[in-house]
């Protein structure tokens, strides 16, 4: 969330691409940020509705794109200069390479136009043979943030281990000094749980809420 705020607060910021593996929390994080920081959120999901890619197959004039999106989405597409963010989810699932290429070119047009912010999310972007990613993306047309599953430290925070305790553990680890046995046993327990639960946000939240491994394994 901090990186998203830094991006928005940067003067003249470019369209943003948030990439990472599926289910690592990209869509949730982006939509949560968008709803809290913009008056209007226009949302497209190319995985659920691949036909949306056709919006970017014709003219890349921003007013034309806005008109087409307004026609497709109706009242769910409100475009107000400086108050609207366009969220393009699962951009790698554009059904045609040509449309995908024009989609990435469109980012440059949105940057030049400047009236509306654009945030795209993508899974496995840049992985050879996956999706319909264009061979090249215009240099300087976008800002990219990589998102990863929760690491062990973040897993500790989610399970109620405070930052001062984590800092103390890190200090002891660096100095190779022992910690109290009760704390050591608790960390071993959490490490084993992390090995099973993993770092995907849905799985971690389910575990935090239920403390039941069978609930986690159903995800």
Task: Set out the residue ranges of the language-model regions.
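Short glycine-rich substrate-engagement loop in P-loop NTPases that contacts/grips substrate
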Residues: 48-84
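Conserved lysine of the Walker
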Residues: 26
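Structural recognition of the conserved hydrophobic beta-strand(s) that form the central parallel beta-sheet
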Residues: 87, 117-123, 146, 155
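Pre-Walker A adenine-sensing motif
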Residues: 1-11
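Interdomain hinge/linker elements that couple catalytic modules in large macromolecular machines
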Residues: 160-219
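Short regulatory helix/loop adjacent to the ATP-binding pocket of P-loop NTPases
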Residues: 126-142, 156-161
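Hydrophobic positions on the alpha1 helix immediately C-terminal to the Walker A/P-loop
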Residues: 29, 33
């Amino acid at each position: 969330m901090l990186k998203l705020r830094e991006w928005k607060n940067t003067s003249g910021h470019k369209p943003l691409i948030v990439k990472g593996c599926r289910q690592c929390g990209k869509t949730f994080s982006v939509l949560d940020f968008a709803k809290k920081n913009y008056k209007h959120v226009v949302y497209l999901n190319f995985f659920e509705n691949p036909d949306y890619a056709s919006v970017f197959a014709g003219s890349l004039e921003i007013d034309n794109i806005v008109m087409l999106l307004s026609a497709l989405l109706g009242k769910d597409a409100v475009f107000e200069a400086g108050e609207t963010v366009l969220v393009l989810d699962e951009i790698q699932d554009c059904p045609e390479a040509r449309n995908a290429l024009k989609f990435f070119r469109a980012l440059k047009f949105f940057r030049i136009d400047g009236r509306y912010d654009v945030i795209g999310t993508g899974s496995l972007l840049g992985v050879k043979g996956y999706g319909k990613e264009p061979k090249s993306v215009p240099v300087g047309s976008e800002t990219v943030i990589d998102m990863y599953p929760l690491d062990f430290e973040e897993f500790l925070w989610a399970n109620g281990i405070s930052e001062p305790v984590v800092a103390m553990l890190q200090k002891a680890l660096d100095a190779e000094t022992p910690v109290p046995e009760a704390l050591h046993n608790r960390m071993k327990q959490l490490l084993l749980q992390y090995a099973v639960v993993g770092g995907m946000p849905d799985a971690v939240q389910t575990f935090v809420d239920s403390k039941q491994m069978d609930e986690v394994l159903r995800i």
